[in-house]
Amino acid sequence: MQGNKSTIREYKIVVVGGGGVGKSALTIQFIQSYFVDEYDPTIEDSYRKQVVIDDKVSILDILDTAGQEEYSAMREQYMRTGEGFLLVYSVTSRNSFDELLSYYQQIQRVKDSDYIPVVVVGNKLDLENERQVSYEDGLRLAKQLNAPFLETSAKQAINVDEAFYSLIRLVRDDGGKYNSMNRQLDNTNEIRDSELTSSATADREKKNNGSYVLDNSLTNAGTGSSSKSAVNHNGETTKRTDEKNYVNQNNNNEGNTKYSSNGNGNRSDISRGNQNNALNSRSKQSAEPQKNSSANARKESSGGCCIIC
């Protein structure tokens, strides 16, 4: 997007922080999209870049300052001319974080203003294994200064443009929209905090749920085995019961036949076959008395003959 030169606003931005925190690396990454790996202590470097922020063309005049204590006398000069400040510390250096408040207090004293456009930047995010300053510590300091907060990596170009753009918006709006934007950035930070907390909680729950699921799996597996065993057991029981009933039925048939022989064939639970056997038994029993009666008759007749003769 092009604009008339007369309508293009120029912003004086000052990058402030201790030595070795990566101020030059951030600035060069923003200006040239290039990462400077070597550390070369800066006395004072100035850069210019034209950018489009929110459809508005702007020219940034960026002053990269010295962080060494021996150049502290030069600070008040560029603090007077600066419109917005990036307060940079390294997440790998607790000392650089602790001294950041003194930089802000010096800016306040020199500017003699209630509101100073400032963005707190925690650089070297890529060196997570060397971290000495937590994200929460940086966020608390930013809230104390009533300033937005970002963690950046000049090496990996993380949040570099966002840091400068956020500062330009503060300067451009003369702080008029600062509170709403700060709330927006705070919400973003809170969302990140929530995501980090949720992630940690999710990990713990995942571990706990893993054990729970494992326990349930084992329990379900045991229940499944028990159910299966129960089914098998019931099947075997049913089979054994059927076999037992079959044997009992045969035994009962034999027993009923035996009982019929003894005159107990009138039992109500006897089978049809057993009933026939019982009838045959009763017929046999009826025949036996008749046979005995004929024998007795013959015996009596025989005896009678003897008496007659």
UniProtKB/Swiss-Prot annotation:
Q: How does it sit in the membrane?
A: Lipid-anchor
Q: Which family does it belong to?
A: Belongs to the small GTPase superfamily. Ras family.
- Molecular function (GO) terms listed? G protein activity; GDP binding; GTP binding; GTPase activity
Q: Which organism is it from?
A: Saccharomyces cerevisiae (strain ATCC 204508 / S288c) (Baker's yeast)
PROSITE patterns for this protein: RAS (PS51421)
The UniProt entry's GO CC annotations, sorted and at most eight, read: cell periphery; cytoplasm; nucleus; plasma membrane
Q: Report the subcellular localization.
A: Cell membrane
Name of the featured protein: Ras-like protein 1
Q: Which residues form the propeptide?
A: 307-309
